[in-house]
């Protein structure tokens, strides 16, 4: 199959007010060209709307009709992300006619993992048909629902792309990819046919929520608060006894499954230190679950910009930690690139999730296609 140009979109559960947009050329198996990437801010009005929507989603919790705010938020974010796609493509000297497909993940507002006797449920806001009409380009969307209807976790979906990246870099077995978004997820590949992926625990979401609750901004910028704080080791040890952390994979999390309340009663510095250490400790427990424990973690996502997080990963997870850029990847772009890659797989009828990554009963094609 000939590679085609595809655009990927991602807005994470951390709600940082930005749209990640990436352009790659791929056949859905290999990456032919890393085109370009941009981080484009939402207008404040949409950011506020999404925060209200997340609150409404948690109150709804898949019971009864969807909150009315979903429709309003869905249209607003679809229009904003469509504009971001056009701006990226035209800024790269191309037109939408050059783009084979857009991968539109949408905004996750609620994700409930399956339990024994109960299928999981997930809701991403994003109107693929509207985006198709705005861009006149095929749009792949709703990537997670089919996997969950079949009994899978619906997450993480990055495994196919992470594996393609590792294959291109000749990295396997002793190397794993860790993405630090709102939630942290890991992908391990044995270099042959075995790929394992799962959510390890929280990453930026509880830390950012805690910082916001203290009125100190949106995040622990440069890890300054966490670095200045002291970790309550007894409290951390108790938190690390959470059964999720030793539960066998496949497994997935909602961004609110581990919350800022873990640091209740602590000052800003000590709370940031505790939450950062918890993320690192949870990753360490995840590494112990893998078929072989990797010696190196290649880290992507926003959390890698936090030097305290990176240092704690090395010391508390007992692993060498390197930036995605050390392998020639763009660590900020990986998630958006992933959905461009998956969109091509949807377009070509290829699976996007697997029994060893989401627990689906067989490789799942997934995704819907508009256009």
UniProtKB/Swiss-Prot annotation:
Keyword Kinase in record: yes
Any one GO BP annotation for this protein: amino sugar metabolic process
UniProt KW DNA damage keyword: no
Gene Ontology terms for molecular function: ATP binding; kinase activity; phosphotransferase activity, alcohol group as acceptor
Transmembrane segments: none
Catalytic activity reported: 1,6-anhydro-N-acetyl-beta-muramate + ATP + H2O = N-acetyl-D-muramate 6-phosphate + ADP + H(+)
Binding site for ATP: 12-20
Coiled coil: none
A Pfam family of this chain: AnmK
InterPro entries in UniProt: Anhydro_N_Ac-Mur_kinase, ATPase_NBD
Family per record: Belongs to the anhydro-N-acetylmuramic acid kinase family.
Task of the protein: Catalyzes the specific phosphorylation of 1,6-anhydro-N-acetylmuramic acid (anhMurNAc) with the simultaneous cleavage of the 1,6-anhydro ring, generating MurNAc-6-P. Is required for the utilization of anhMurNAc either imported from the medium or derived from its own cell wall murein, and thus plays a role in cell wall recycling.
The name this protein goes by in its record: Anhydro-N-acetylmuramic acid kinase
Organism: Mesorhizobium japonicum (strain LMG 29417 / CECT 9101 / MAFF 303099) (Mesorhizobium loti (strain MAFF 303099))
Gene: anmK
